[in-house]
Amino acid sequence: MQTLHALLRDIPAPDAEAMARAQQHIDGLLKPPGSLGRLETLAVQLAGMPGLNGTPQVGEKAVLVMCADHGVWDEGVAVSPKIVTAIQAANMTRGTTGVCVLAAQAGAKVYVIDVGIDAEPIPGVVDMRVARGCGNIAVGPAMSRSQAEALLLEVSRYTCDLAQRGVTLFGVGELGMANTTPAAAMVSVFTGSDAKEVVGIGANLPPSRIDNKVDVVRRAIAINQPNPRDGIDVLSKVGGFDLVGMTGVILGAARCGLPVLLDGFLSYSAALAACQIAPAVRPYLIPSHFSAEKGARIALAHLSMEPYLHMAMRLGEGSGAALAMPIVEAACAMFHNMGELAASNIVLPEGNANAT
């Protein structure tokens, strides 16, 4: 049975030769070189992923939604009742939530995964529950390090199993009342930013309660003293089961040499953790949308990422990842279906990249 250490060790490097071939092919397509902008760079990125066999392509698509409750909800950092996590998880199994509708439109399957819902088991939800909610980070750690490591490994294996069954494009999502608080704590730790700079309204927290949320994040960091150079330490001390789960999806997809679409602010925090745990995951990450949550810009700057969509979204659930899947497919279509300049006897002068 593979250990977490072995999984991290086996994350492949991108295929530089395949990327060079892809760039050469794209430059010869029926258009001025570079005129399709980031669609071209996305195709080259995909070509370098070993799990796609040297060419941009999309098979089955999946959005993995990690569902869990948080002890820090008790600190008054969320307006929604905790039971909403379980209610919405059940709604996901019926296909009626935002991510389900957007994923269906994109032709993707949604996997609803219970990693720590504080309720009875829900039919149709994948059971990876660690506990009924994590610890209150304002008074102590979210979980033990061993719990975090075990969940990372379990989710990574599950992701790789889906890859073996034909999934080639993953999206990450989450569901959990109060989970923007631990996400803000993680972003604060990884980026060295004060809580005031990264704490937002989450699911419509009234402005009058923001200062309390900022204070809770500061207390969580002061009490737990997470090490910013140790991603698992940060996850276990000021994270949550859903955040660990998303990190596991990223690690698993990278291990299989496959792309993973990030969602919003919660996924940025998981990406920061994943990149700290295993820097080799970075080339497999695709940012979907620019979250409207306050700390998004800081997190994305630290990740050196510019999302493809600016939609003022902050729903979470993996909604942005689902919405961006057609962009990935468009990059593949461009690569495979456009004609070539040579076939039409077109010779463009050098330096024509900006031609229209």
UniProtKB/Swiss-Prot annotation:
Species, as recorded: Salmonella agona (strain SL483)
Name of the protein: Nicotinate-nucleotide--dimethylbenzimidazole phosphoribosyltransferase
Keyword vocabulary terms for this entry: Cobalamin biosynthesis, Glycosyltransferase, Transferase
Matches recorded under HAMAP family: CobT
CDD domains in UniProt: DMB-PRT_CobT (cd02439)
EC number(s) reported in the record: 2.4.2.21
GO MF, one example: nicotinate-nucleotide-dimethylbenzimidazole phosphoribosyltransferase activity
This protein's record includes keyword Glycosyltransferase: yes
Active site: 317
Transmembrane segment boundaries: none
Reaction(s) the record says it catalyses: 5,6-dimethylbenzimidazole + nicotinate beta-D-ribonucleotide = alpha-ribazole 5'-phosphate + nicotinate + H(+)
Pfam family, one: DBI_PRT
Family: Belongs to the CobT family.
Purpose: Catalyzes the synthesis of alpha-ribazole-5'-phosphate from nicotinate mononucleotide (NAMN) and 5,6-dimethylbenzimidazole (DMB).
Complex and partners: Homodimer.
Example GO BP: cobalamin biosynthetic process
Pathway in which this enzyme or protein is active: Nucleoside biosynthesis; alpha-ribazole biosynthesis; alpha-ribazole from 5,6-dimethylbenzimidazole: step 1/2
